[in-house]
Amino acid sequence: GEFTRLMMEETGATGPWAGFNVMLAANMLREAAAMTTQISGEIIPSDKPGTLAMAIRQPAGVCLGIAPWNAPVILGTRALAMPLACGNTVVLKASEMCPGTHRLIGQVLVEIGRAS
């Protein structure tokens, strides 16, 4: 597809290697999506009688992802997948050597309503 073609053009990767990277990136996204059902808080026994302590998991806020040029699809996706799944905002610093690949990742996120 388009990710494979762009990775081949921008990095000089072979078709099979680029396709493998796209497959790995898709698997990372599936794994991150599955993790969203497992993010929860905990109730912890307290030293004080009659009370409970709670640990609440919440987003960290704004995260920075730095995506290098050598494997832009998989490394760009890795920088985004888990932070987004945990409810964070992510700013991706894309490599100037492969802007098309990282731009396409952003376009896909906009299309599915996960970025603006």
Label each residue range with its predicted role:
Residues 41-116:
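Rossmann-like NAD(P) dinucleotide-binding subdomain of oxidoreductase/dehydrogenase enzymes
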Residues 1-51:
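N-terminal Rossmann-like NAD(P)+-binding subdomain of aldehyde/semialdehyde dehydrogenases
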